[in-house]
Swiss-Prot record:
<feature type="transmembrane region" description="Helical">
    <location>
        <begin position="195"/>
        <end position="215"/>
    </location>
</feature>
<feature type="topological domain" description="Cytoplasmic">
    <location>
        <begin position="1"/>
        <end position="15"/>
    </location>
</feature>
<comment type="subunit">
    <text>Homodimer. Constituent of tobamovirus replication complex.</text>
</comment>
<feature type="region of interest" description="Disordered">
    <location>
        <begin position="226"/>
        <end position="261"/>
    </location>
</feature>
<feature type="transmembrane region" description="Helical">
    <location>
        <begin position="144"/>
        <end position="164"/>
    </location>
</feature>
<feature type="compositionally biased region" description="Polar residues">
    <location>
        <begin position="247"/>
        <end position="260"/>
    </location>
</feature>
<keyword id="KW-1133">Transmembrane helix</keyword>
<feature type="topological domain" description="Cytoplasmic">
    <location>
        <begin position="216"/>
        <end position="281"/>
    </location>
</feature>
<feature type="topological domain" description="Extracellular">
    <location>
        <begin position="37"/>
        <end position="110"/>
    </location>
</feature>
<feature type="topological domain" description="Extracellular">
    <location>
        <begin position="165"/>
        <end position="194"/>
    </location>
</feature>
<comment type="function">
    <text>May be involved in the regulation of cell differentiation.</text>
</comment>
<feature type="modified residue" description="Phosphoserine">
    <location>
        <position position="256"/>
    </location>
</feature>
<feature type="transmembrane region" description="Helical">
    <location>
        <begin position="111"/>
        <end position="131"/>
    </location>
</feature>
<keyword id="KW-0597">Phosphoprotein</keyword>
<keyword id="KW-0472">Membrane</keyword>
<dbReference type="GO" id="GO:0005774">
    <property type="term" value="C:vacuolar membrane"/>
</dbReference>
<comment type="similarity">
    <text>Belongs to the tetraspanin (TM4SF) family.</text>
</comment>
Amino acid sequence: MRHNCCHVSFASILKILNFLQAFIGISIIIYSIWMLDQYNHHVPVDPPPSQPPAASSPDSSYSFSNSIIEINSVSDSLKNPIDFVSGIVLGSGGGDSGFNLRSLDLPAPWFIYCFMAIGILVCIVTIIGFIAAEAINGCCLCFYSILKTLLIIIEAALVGFIVIDRHWEKDLPYDPTGELNSLRAFIEENIDICKWVGIVVVAIQLLSLLLALVLRAMVSPRQSELDDEDDFENPMSRARDNLLGPQANQTSSGSSNIDNWRSRIREKYGLINSQSHTPSA
């Protein structure tokens, strides 16, 4: 299918935006590999000192009643799934018995793995965007728009988690690599630059999504118009063939009749000449 100049222009802009996002994703992956190498070849950060065990209470019935109260509070939280999920995300479990992300058994460099997963996800979505911009296909553009929307929602959820929960670092598992604290300190020292970088990244992603939706809307009517033109041209060509078919048959039959007539005339003329030459001989 041929594409007009407008389709090619929008696709070229979408390729440029995807190239910028691919650069961001590759940078995240390279930085994650560097952090993992630093963690593997250097002494990891010591874990925080564990709290001393609480002194045993002389009254065993009091401790038993406290455990019953904790079990009841957990069961009450399970009855309300929305509150339970919000308690998991925000870490507000109601006291020490609340379930938070620190209770999860994660590998030691979990922050590095999560950071690398974000870079890989950005690169995958970017590759799909390149394919969609090159093919200018409706299905590819629709799939790319869905993935880009999900990626933006995940990023918005992470930002919302940090903004809503003022003590979000206490709700996350302990990072023995120390890279989370280093990244946070770097962002706090260069908060103005990081704000502008974040705004530019979000603007690039939103503009990519908008271009994909516009290009998807432009491709669909064009494809339907071409299908309608094909459907209109096929009956016309068939009707033209039906009209021209008898004439072609008549022409071929007429030419064959003329050839037969000429061959008969030649045979007759040849016969007459032979008869005229025999008496003279």
